[in-house]
Amino acid sequence: MGYGRDQQYNKSNFNSRGGDFRGDRSSDRNSYNRDRNDNFGQRGGNQGGRSFNQPQELIKPNWEEELPNLPVFEKNFYQEAESVKARSDQEINEFRREHEMTITGHDIPKPITSFDEAGFPDYVLEEVKAEGFEKPTGIQCQGWPMALSGRDMIGVAATGSGKTLSYCLPGIVHINAQPLLSPGDGPIVLVLAPTRELAVQIQKECSKFGSSSRIRNSCVYGGVPRGQQIRELSRGAEIVIATPGRLIDMLEIGKTNLKRVTYLVLDEADRMLDMGFEPQIRKIVDQIRPDRQTLMWSATWPKEVKQLAHDYLNDPIQVQIGSLELSASHNITQLVEVVSDFEKRDRLLKHLETASEDKDSKILVFASTKRTCDEVTKYLREDGWPALAIHGDKDQRERDWVLQEFREGRSPIMVATDVAARGIGMYTNFFFQFCIFFTTN
C-alpha cells in the first residue's frame, strides 16, 4: 500500500474570561484611564487619523520621563504548591537531570510536575484538560513557574517541545489581571515570530486556550492585504501575534500602538536574527515600557541572541533543555546517504516508495532554495506523486491552502524551504533533506 500504488494515493488516479487573578477589572480600567499619560508613545503608533500614505517614523520615547507617569501593573501570580515546597533539593536536581534541564540565574522557582501544581486558575486548567494532555513537558514544568513569577526569562528548547503553551497560558493569566482595554488601546500581550506560518500556529493556540476568558487576538503578518488585519486591530485585541516587518507598518500608520504591552514574547529569537529582523525587533521593543515582563525563546543560544537578551531583559532567569549546541533529536532515526546530484531524483523516488507503504504517512521534503523546491515538486507530480510546494514566493492564500491539503492528507507530500516549513506544527512521519543547507539550523 502506498501513495503511488494503492487506492487513496494511486498515481494513475491522482489528479494533477473569568476566574482567579482577575479582580475588579472594570474599576481598574477607570483608574488606568485616569492615570494614563495621554502623550506617551504619541510618535510610536498612536491612532490619530493618519493615512496609509503618511507613515511616521517610530521614535523611542524618553523612558526616564515617561515611566514615572505610567500606572503600575501586576505580573507576579505564582503561588508555590505545598507539594512543590516539600520536595528536597535532591529530588529537584534529579528531576532536572532526567529532563536534561540546565538553569541559570538566582531565586529560580522549583519545577512543577503536574498541571495542578502550576497554580493556574480553574478556567485555564479546564482548557488544558479538555485537550487531553496528561502531564506538562519538561520546558513547561520549569517554564510555567518562571513565567508566572513575573520575572524576565529565557527558554532554550527545540521546536516542538511545548514552548508555545509555556508562554501562552501565563500570558492569559497576565491579561486577566490587567485593566480592560479601552477604545484605541493596543494589546497587552505581544508575541513576535519570524514567519507567517509560526504566527498563525501561535494564534491557534491562543484562540484555543483564551476562549473561556473571551480574550481576543489578532495575527499580523505580511504577504496579504492589510485591510482585515487593520479591522481586527481597530476592534481591539488583548493578544497580538506578529512578524516584525508588518507590525512596524501598522505602528507607523497609526493602526495600533504598544502603550499597553506589559508582557512581551520573542519566539524563535535565533531564527528572527538569522532572517535579518534584528533592527526591526529593536525598533519595536524600544516602543514598549521597560518595566514589562519579557520572555525570550530560542532553539539555540548564539552570541547574537545573548546580546539581544543582554540589551532588553532585566536580570533574567534561564532554563535550557538539552545541549546549548544543536544536536539530533533522540526521537528521530536518521539515515545519511551521500549521492551525486544526478542520482538524487531516483534515490528520492525510491525512498518515497518505502515511506508511502503506510497510506497515512505525511512526508516533508526540504530543499535549500525556492527554485529547487519548485523543481522537485514538478518532477514528483510528473511522476504521479501528490506533492505540493511551499516557500516565501507563494502568496499567503496559496500557502494556507497547501498547508491545509498537507494537514488533511489530500496531498501527503510537501516540498518546502526550511524557513517556510518552520512552525508548521503538525505531525510528520518522514523528512527528506534533498539539499544540504549551509547553516547549522
Curated annotation (Swiss-Prot):
Q: What class of enzyme is it?
A: hydrolase
Positions occupied by motif Q motif: 113-141
Respond yes or no to whether keyword tRNA processing is given for this record: no
Keyword annotations from UniProtKB, A to Z: ATP-binding, Cytoplasm, Helicase, Hydrolase, Nonsense-mediated mRNA decay, Nucleotide-binding, Nucleus, Ribosome biogenesis, RNA-binding, rRNA processing
Classification via SMART domains: DEXDc, HELICc
Q: Where in the cell is it found?
A: Cytoplasm; Nucleus
Domain of life, per the record? Eukaryota
Q: Residue ranges of the Helicase ATP-binding domain?
A: 144-319
Q: Name one GO molecular function term.
A: ATP hydrolysis activity
Task: Please note every region of biased composition (Basic and acidic residues).
Answer: 19-38
Disulfide cysteine pairs (residue numbers): none
Q: Which reactions is this enzyme annotated as catalysing?
A: ATP + H2O = ADP + phosphate + H(+)
Q: Where does ATP bind?
A: 157-164
Quote the PANTHER family the UniProt record gives: ATP-DEPENDENT RNA HELICASE DBP3
Name the protein family: Belongs to the DEAD box helicase family. DDX5/DBP2 subfamily.
What's the record's remark on domains?
The Q motif is unique to and characteristic of the DEAD box family of RNA helicases and controls ATP binding and hydrolysis.
| Name of this protein | ATP-dependent RNA helicase DBP2
Q: What is the species listed in this Swiss-Prot or TrEMBL entry?
A: Vanderwaltozyma polyspora (strain ATCC 22028 / DSM 70294 / BCRC 21397 / CBS 2163 / NBRC 10782 / NRRL Y-8283 / UCD 57-17) (Kluyveromyces polysporus)
